């Protein structure tokens, strides 16, 4: 074959534009050359002339050539195939439709006839069974009637009917009262069975609901009962505590003289003031009698501080005095007098207001009364006690010597 040289667009004047309507076909004698111009691929055909030279012609693009060459042949083939297929199908379609319709109708008719025959056979068999069972029931007795209480088959036409028809057919064959009674008993038994089932179901549902309620209550009652019990126990404990506290407050009110206050705070204030006055009185009386005691704790439960020899009416009871009282006596003055309020010292000027039947008392004056031995000390030990002279003063008291009695307590006597 001859080589296919590429020619430029400027050297070929006989060019056919792509938009031209000329669409010549290729033949075996022709030669084709592909040329690319402006982004399009063009085909160039060379035909031999009479003198042996080739005539150059331009054609359209390859797509146009493909469409022109193969579209016409494809259309012809489609027409041929369509003609060959459509003609026999158009002739055979109505015949096939008729045949299929006839076959469907025949099948439907056969199915209907078979269904009708089947239903008839089933109904006949059911009637025969019912009649035979009823005859057997009348002969044997009502005990075997429970076997025939089953409803008819699901495939029969009598499924939708009630049990009345089931027993009505049997009444035709009955010739005596025994058969009628058996039918009635069957109806009653069937109804009783239904009622029992319904009641059983209802009872089950009620039981389930009751169980659920009891479970819910059992779960919710436990914390409630615990809370109630705890609150009740707490209330009882509080009541007991209040009763004991009230009893103690009443006892304290009875101990305080001329105290008619019911308020707890005021009652405690009065008790505090009364105890302070008693402490000061004990200290003053001990200094007046010349008994200078060291800073120790002395037992004061068995005797009153008022009965120390000043002929003062003892108004305080032994129970009103505490068991131990601190007696920090100093030589320069009375203990606690500097910090004492003026209300506590009012008994010096008016002691009869606090304790009745008590004369005015001055601690530093001469004591002419004899010393009274406390009740807790025996008479054998009382001989060891001595009495201060009438001219006892503060200097003599400071120079006094300590004397220990046989009872273990420390007392003082004059150097004479």
From Swiss-Prot:
Function: Transcription factor. Involved in responses to transient and long-term shade. Required for the light-mediated inhibition of hypocotyl elongation. Necessary for rapid light-induced expression of the photomorphogenesis- and circadian-related gene APRR9. Seems to play a role in multiple PHYB responses, such as flowering transition and petiole elongation.
Gene Ontology biological process terms, A to Z: callus formation; red or far-red light signaling pathway; regulation of DNA-templated transcription; shade avoidance
Localisation: Nucleus
Subunit structure, as described in the record: Homodimer. Interacts with APRR1/TOC1. Associates to PTAC12/HMR/PAP5 which acts as a transcriptional coactivator.
Gene Ontology molecular function: DNA binding; DNA-binding transcription factor activity; protein dimerization activity
Listed name of the protein: Transcription factor PIL1
Coiled coil segments of this chain: 95-124
Gene name in the database record: PIL1
Stored SMART domains: HLH (SM00353)
GO cellular component: nucleus
PROSITE patterns from the UniProt entry: BHLH
Organism superkingdom: Eukaryota
């Amino acid at each position: 074959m001859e080589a296919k040289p590429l020619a430029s667009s400027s050297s070929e004047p006989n060019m056919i534009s792509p938009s031209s309507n000329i669409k010549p076909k290729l033949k075996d004698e022709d030669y084709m050359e592909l040329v690319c111009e402006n982004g399009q691929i063009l085909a160039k055909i060379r035909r031999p002339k009479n003198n042996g030279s080739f005539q150059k012609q331009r054609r359209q693009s390859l797509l146009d050539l493909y469409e022109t060459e193969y579209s016409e042949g494809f259309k012809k083939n489609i027409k041929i195939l369509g003609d060959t297929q459509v003609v026999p199908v158009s002739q055979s379609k109505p015949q096939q439709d008729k045949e299929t319709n006839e076959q469907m109708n025949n099948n439907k008719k056969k199915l209907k006839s078979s269904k009708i025959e089947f239903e008839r056979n089933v109904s006949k068999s059911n009637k025969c069974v019912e009649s035979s069972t009823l005859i057997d029931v009348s002969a044997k007795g009502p005990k075997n009637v429970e076997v025939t209480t089953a409803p008819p088959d699901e495939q029969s036409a009598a499924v939708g009917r009630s049990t009345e028809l089931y027993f009505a057919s049997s009444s035709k064959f009955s010739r005596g009262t025994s058969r009628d009674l058996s039918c009635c008993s069957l109806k009653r038994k069937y109804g009783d069975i239904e009622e029992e089932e319904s009641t059983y179901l209802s009872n089950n549902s009620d039981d389930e609901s009751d169980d659920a309620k009891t479970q819910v209550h059992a779960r919710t009652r436990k914390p409630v009962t615990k809370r109630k019990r705890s609150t009740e126990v707490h209330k009882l404990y509080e009541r007991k505590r209040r009763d004991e506290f009230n009893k103690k407050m009443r006892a304290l009110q009875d101990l305080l003289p001329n105290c008619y206050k019911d308020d707890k705070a005021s009652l405690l204030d009065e008790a505090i003031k009364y105890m302070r006055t008693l402490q000061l009185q004990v200290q003053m009386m001990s200094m007046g009698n010349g008994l200078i005691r060291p800073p120790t704790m002395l037992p004061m439960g068995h005797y009153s501080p008022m009965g120390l020899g000043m002929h003062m009416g003892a108004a305080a009871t032994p129970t009103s005095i505490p068991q131990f009282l601190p007696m920090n006596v100093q030589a320069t003055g009375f203990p606690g007098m500097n910090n004492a309020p003026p209300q506590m010292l009012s008994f010096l000027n008016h002691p009869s207001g606090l304790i009745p039947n008590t004369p005015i008392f001055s601690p530093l004056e001469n004591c002419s009364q004899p010393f009274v031995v406390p009740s807790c000390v025996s008479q054998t030990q009382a001989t060891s006690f001595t009495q201060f002279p009438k001219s006892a003063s503060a200097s003599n008291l400071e120079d006094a010597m300590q004397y220990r009695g046989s009872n273990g307590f420390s007392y003082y006597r004059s150097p004479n």
